[in-house]
Swiss-Prot record:
Subcellular location: Cell membrane
Gene of this entry: chs1
One Pfam family named in its UniProt record: Chitin_synth_1
Name by which UniProt lists this protein: Chitin synthase 1
One of the protein's GO biological processes: ascospore wall assembly
KW Cell wall biogenesis/degradation (keyword) present: yes
Organism of origin: Fusarium oxysporum f. sp. lycopersici (strain 4287 / CBS 123668 / FGSC 9935 / NRRL 34936)
Class of this enzyme: transferase
Keywords associated with the record: Cell membrane, Cell wall biogenesis/degradation, Glycoprotein, Glycosyltransferase, Membrane, Transferase, Transmembrane, Transmembrane helix
GO function terms (MF aspect): chitin synthase activity
Main location per the UniProt record: membrane
Region: Disordered, residue numbers: 1-154
Length: 903
């Protein structure tokens, strides 16, 4: 933390944050009333008067002394001495047009108490129920507010030139929200509802605080403590995806505000929550999404600037406390007014710099100013459950050592599960479910989750901080931004940081002299849409597989880093067991393509035995073997030279072929096992039911496979979530060869591609600039009529259902950057992978002679081959069953702990 934090003499009975939110302060805060007061956040003198704004119909909100917010706008220099009577605004809004803008708030070097410049009555303790100002009833007689103010002085709209004051070169404007929006929501004279605050950041995120930028929460008479800091990162998501996420966030905030008996939450819980939306590139944001933000009052067109005093603006920051929520009806987003207030922070980055840069703005720029307790990460399109964010927070509240947590990611299945009709969606649904039933609970039981998904996870802010030497989790996390920004980086590191969230988890748990753990919170759910076409799935899994594979290698190689942590010996031993388990899984993942071919070859060849299919089985075995080779080679050729988007039909055809292969393999396994049982039944020595389990073929094929399925079913039933076994198991089984062959082949053949797939043209419309002399400059700002007209235009953008318009790709999007070095290393990785897998197949099929499985026990010369075949098949199939059993044990322990923990 910055050494200037906490420099103010201690005036609070609890001058420091408690070690854990599990022991909340009596006042309900985990932080001082003024933890950052070093004089940088002084208040204005008594000459600053407040601008009275028209109250909303029928009701208004009463501000409290602690909620007093200084007007923080760029005012006309002609009105610096003060404003006219506040009440005149309601009579003629145009007459006080300039009064919207007053001196921009900026920190002062000297230290000042919070009550400076106010009446002496504020020296007494804060009373949230005592109004700061004498409010007039909203239904008091007054002239109705006019949406179309009178034209004044021949000034052209959108060309209202204002002189603004800058402090140390920072442009900060407090802009009035459109009157038509203001009339829809209750408000008083508190300008967090009546004004939108714009800051033009001209610095790197790491320098945001040092360059004297601040945020609204620090400007109140009693700075608001941020308990929950929620970030929604987006690129070019449309209004439906954005509204889906924001709807879930708003429901969570309402849920926390409706917990009157909570020590932390309650009626004013929204004051402790800040929702940050970071959009990756001004040229990339979806126009409908931008219009939606404008409809909420968070964004205004025509305010942003390109440069300030010759310095390029890196991010446009809009702050507003909105009372306008969203709802989706018939694929159209609608605004819902008069809802729970939500503190919004919208950061529109000037250039596209990828998601990791968006997180750097969130953590290092805004997080340093607000110093939140818990940070929640969401992707636009992920919809959290109605109380999921609360349950994530509760996990930190109950466990002081919890440094990070994640919930259950669900596949979006549509109304009545209609998306399950798509086999790809059903297969991914099964994947997600089993991961949340077996994998995540196992890792949570050990205390180390290999990846907290960036789409829906949470971290304790203090746990992420670097040490005094600048080393720590965030330092390692943001290293990936420079690696992908053009600096010299090896292929290993570049691919590893495709899964930068895995690196963050590892560095958090192994943090020096700390003992943070990671937890899975089953009661917290997040719903996301999954790829519904083969090409989208291939592109998504390329980054997932490569990133997770190289990150797993990084974790295994750096396992000794756990020794630098402050974990107990028992916890470190548990980590050791978990890493052995992860190493075994990684070995199986490396040899997955070889193992699948061996199982295929052994089963199909065995069907050619005279006691099985005979000549028909031999012919089918040869045909399927040739087709297997052709389609596998096709996978390599497509992966090495073609874009999936241009080869969609071929990839779809391969999915169908591998599904047919899987059907044939399932038939072979069942048919061979049944024939083996029949042979035992017809044995001349008589039949005993126990002999079935002594039959090696039945024991190897049926028991091992069914034990895996049985574990899946039992675990799903115990978790009270078994429906995917009925709706998605068959699709998952049929697409398993596609996951093994198509996705793995494409991922390894494209290890040279270290992009997120979001590169593009950064050309964007130029914005006006501001140049100042002696801290004073001129800029164009809209008047009230402009605000209303602009607001209506923004509403019209998303009023109708979106119609997809096909656009011609730009030349820059069609060109591929030449990466000879990466492609050379890619070739080496693919060759090693292919040779090792083919070597395994050759060893088993040629050297060991394990090319047949036959239930016929009369041929003595095949006894040795059968024995060795059983050995190999037993190792493969029972290893799968054993790994599933290990996950099952971990999941059961997770349930036992969860019964006592409560979340």
């Amino acid at each position: 933390m910055d050494p200037r934090y906490g420099a103010q003499p201690q005036q609070h009975p609890h001058p420091h944050r408690t070690p854990s939110p599990g022991q909340p302060l009596q006042q309900g805060y985990q932080l001082d009333d003024n933890p950052f007061d070093d004089g940088r956040y002084g208040q204005y003198g008594p000459s600053q008067q407040h601008l009275a704004m028209p109250s909303g119909p029928d009701q208004h909100r009463l501000p409290t002394p602690s909620d007093h917010l200084n007007l923080n706008a760029a005012q006309s220099v002609d009105n610096l001495s003060g404003y006219g009577p506040p009440g005149d605004y309601a009579v003629n809004p145009e007459a006080h047009h300039d009064a919207y803008y007053n001196q921009p708030y900026e920190p002062r070097p000297q230290q000042q108490p919070y009550d400076q410049g106010y009446d002496q009555e504020y020296d007494q303790p804060y009373d949230d129920h005592r109004p700061m100002l004498q409010h007039q009833p909203s239904d008091a007689p007054s002239e109705p507010y006019q949406d179309q103010p009178q034209q004044g002085g021949g000034i052209k709209r959108w060309k209202t030139v204002k002189q603004v004051l800058l402090y140390r070169g920072n442009l900060v404007l407090d802009c009035p929200v459109p009157p038509v929006l203001l009339q829809q929501n209750p408000h008083g004279e508190r300008d967090e509802f009546t004004h939108m605050r714009y800051s033009a950041a001209t610095c790197d995120p790491n320098d945001f605080y040092d360059h004297d930028f601040t945020l609204r929460q620090r400007l109140f008479t009693k700075p608001r403590h941020t308990e929950l800091f929620i970030v929604v990162t987006m690129y070019n998501e449309d209004d439906i995806l954005f509204a889906r996420t924001m709807t879930g966030v708003f429901k969570n905030i309402e849920y926390m505000c409706n917990r009157p008996n909570s020590k932390t939450w309650g009626k004013d819980a929204w004051k402790k929550i800040v929702v940050c939306v970071v959009s990756d590139g001004r040229s990339k944001i979806n126009p409908r999404t931008k219009a939606l933000l404008a409809g909420m009052g968070v964004y205004q067109e025509g305010i942003a600037k390109q440069q300030v005093n010759g310095k390029d603006v890196t991010a446009h920051i809009y702050e507003y406390t909105t009372q306008t929520h969203l709802q989706i009806k018939n694929d159209v987003v609608q605004l819902v007014h008069r809802r729970q207030p939500v503190q919004m922070l919208f950061c529109l980055k000037e250039k596209n710099a990828k998601k990791i840069n968006s997180h750097r703005w969130f953590f290092t720029a805004f997080g340093r100013v607000l110093d939140p307790n818990i940070c929640v990460l969401l992707d636009a399109g992920t919809r959290p459950g109605g109380s999921s964010i609360y349950h994530l927070w509760k996990a930190f509240d109950l466990e002081p050592m919890c440094g990070g947590a994640c919930g259950e990611i669900k596949a979006m299945l549509g109304t009545g599960g209609k998306y399950l009709l798509n086999p790809l969606v059903a297969a991914q649904n099964f994947e997600y479910k089993m991961s949340n039933i077996l994998d995540k609970p196992l890792e949570s039981a050990f205390g180390f989750i290999s990846v907290l998904p960036g789409a829906f996870s949470a971290y304790r802010y203090v746990a992420l901080q670097n040490d005094k030497n600048g080393k720590g989790p965030l330092e390692k996390y943001f290293l990936g931004e420079t690696l992908h920004g053009g600096s010299d980086a090896g292929l290993f590191e570049s691919n590893m940081y495709l899964a930068e969230d895995r690196i963050l988890c590892f560095e958090l748990v192994t943090k020096r002299n700390c003992h943070w753990i990671l937890q899975y919170v089953k009661s917290a759910t997040g719903e996301t849409d999954v790829p519904d076409t083969v090409t989208e799935l291939v592109l998504q899994r390329r980054r997932w597989l490569n990133g997770s594979f190289f990150a797993a290698i990084y974790a295994i190689v750096h396992f000794l880093d756990f020794l630098r942590s402050d974990h107990t010996f028992l916890r470190k031993f548990a980590f050791f067991i978990e890493f052995i388990f992860n190493t075994i899984n990684m070995i199986f993942a490396w040899f997955a393509i070889g193992n699948f071919f061996l199982v295929f070859k052994i089963l199909t060849t065995s069907l050619g035995d005279d006691t099985l299919l005979g000549r028909t089985g031999e012919i089918l075995g040869v045909v399927f073997t040739w087709l297997y080779g052709v389609f596998l080679i096709t996978c390599f050729v497509l992966s090495l030279g073609n874009r999936p988007a241009g080869s969609g039909r071929l990839y779809t055809a391969m999915c169908w072929f591998w599904a047919i292969i899987m059907i044939y393999l399932l038939f072979a396994a069942i048919f061979i096992a049944v024939k083996a049982i029949i042979a035992d039944v017809n044995d001349a020595n008589g039949f005993n039911f126990a002999d079935i389990f002594k039959n090696k073929v039945f024991y190897m094929l049926i028991i091992s496979v069914m034990s895996t399925f049985g574990i899946w079913l039992i675990a799903s039933l115990i978790m009270l979530d078994p429906w995917h076994m009925a709706t998605s198991l068959v699709q998952y089984m049929l697409l398993t060869p596609t996951f093994t062959n198509v996705l793995n082949v494409y991922a390894f053949c494209n290890t040279h591609d270290v992009s997120w797939g979001t590169k593009g043209d950064d050309k964007v419309e130029k914005l006006p600039s501001v140049n100042t002399k002696d801290g004073t400059g001129k800029t164009d700002l809209p008047d009230e009529g402009d605000l209303n007209a602009q607001y209506q235009r923004e509403l019209a953008v998303f009023a109708q259902k979106h119609v997809e318009v096909k656009t011609t790709p730009t030349p820059s999007q069609l060109q591929e950057k030449q990466m000879d070095y990466y492609r050379g290393v890619r070739t080496g990785v693919v060759l090693i992978w292919m040779v090792s897998n083919f070597g395994l197949a050759a060893l088993v099929l040629s050297s060991a002679g394990l090319d047949r499985i036959s239930p016929n026990k009369d041929k003595d010369h095949e006894a040795e081959q059968l024995s060795r075949s059983n050995i190999y098949m037993s190792i493969v199939l029972w290893s799968v069953a054993g790994l599933s059993a290990f996950k099952f044990i971990g999941a059961m322990w997770f349930l036992v702990v969860r019964m006592f923990r409560g979340v």
